[in-house]
Amino acid sequence: MSVLQKPRGVKDWYGEELIYFNWTVHQITNLAWKWGFSEVKTPLLEYAEAFKRTNANADIVKKELYEFHDKSNRLLALRPEATAGIVRLVCENKLLQPQNYPLRLFTIGTMYRYERPQSNRYREHYQFSCEVIGDTNPTVLLDTLLLGHAIIQQLGIEGVILKLNNLGNSATIQQWNQALQAYLTQFKAQLTELSQSRLSTNPLRILDDKVDGQLPFISDAPQIEQFLDAEQQALNTWLQQQLTQQQVPFEWNPTLVRGLDYYTGVVFEFVKDDTTVLAGGVYDNLVEELGGTPTKALGFACGIERSINCLSAVKKQAILANQPPRLLVIGLTEAALEKLLQLSLGWRAYHPVTIYPKVIRIINGIRAAQRLGYRFLGVIGGNNLEQQTITVKDLATEQQTTYTWDEFRQRQVL
């Protein structure tokens, strides 16, 4: 019988990769708590309408959505992103109370997109998502951008640039779309089939296309600044001043758009080389579109796999070096092994203790510890039983120390 394989586009987590994963998640969620965010959990399954109502023209809905009818013929979908689910949670559970504004919520979990698997792009992938619901004033916006910057700094990812644009609002986006449609139609024959289809539905996405976005006539296309009012332009100026003062490397990109249809106002991406590590923006209409009252909101998502891939080799070495020390204990006799089982319950309050499951000689115990990745080896033999002691050997330095059982139980010795 052949070995069962995992589905294409998903990833197993184990060993060092899982250590990097847990470290990355801990760093990000710890910062979210420091910024005043509270954690929520939403289901992997939502009604497909939650995504189709808000992103009808987005690729993640038109091409990449995992959707199916259940046995009751209800159309469900695996979530491709977290924002719609969080907003649905807020609306359904009536969390939109003025005394709660703004809500600061975050979640972390798996997202699903049926796209061609490639480097650091998986059909099942992990995202950290945070949302501020109830206010998007300049201070809230800047504070959220600074959280994104702090995440990049905390992870030690170098060479990251914050790219921003201001889409204004629904009216300015519509005006920009119309102007782009009129301008790009004259170049329709030079566009790919995908971009030609977007001309009538969402021409903004042509600017973001990896192929057509590089065509020479794109640089002369209408830009959003032509349609922004004085207040929106003033926000752009203020943001750039504040980011400069905060020493956040940034670049104002007037052609930047996001792949999700619900974004309005400021959109942004933290980019390393050609990899977007963290991205988001303002979405002032989404809450109303999902059944709530008109409510301003903004948020961003950070890809965990991409973040891990951007960690330097030095950072990864430091993460591994800072893991809690692990101890393998062996019994040289049956009586010693039996005693270890009794003692280990108290010891584990202070030390991660793994018991080797059978009687073994010291030299073989050292080899087993090295093979299994343990730095410390604890030994109990006949003399240790009589003296009620354990000998602990540091395999990295080859130093060894003998402790009484009570000493080893009552204090941190590794």
UniProtKB/Swiss-Prot annotation:
Pfam families tied to this protein: HGTP_anticodon (PF03129), tRNA-synt_His (PF13393)
Subcellular location: Cytoplasm
Keyword Aminoacyl-tRNA synthetase tagged: yes
Record keywords: Aminoacyl-tRNA synthetase, ATP-binding, Cytoplasm, Ligase, Nucleotide-binding, Protein biosynthesis
Catalytic activity: tRNA(His) + L-histidine + ATP = L-histidyl-tRNA(His) + AMP + diphosphate + H(+)
Documented EC number(s): 6.1.1.21
Annotated gene: hisS
GO molecular function term, any single one: histidine-tRNA ligase activity
CDD domains per the UniProt record, alphabetical: HisRS-like_core (cd00773)
Enzyme class, broadest EC rank: ligase
Summary of subunit composition and partner proteins: Homodimer.
Gene Ontology terms: cellular component: cytoplasm
Family per record: Belongs to the class-II aminoacyl-tRNA synthetase family.
GO biological process: histidyl-tRNA aminoacylation
Chief localisation class: cytoplasm
Protein name as annotated: Histidine--tRNA ligase
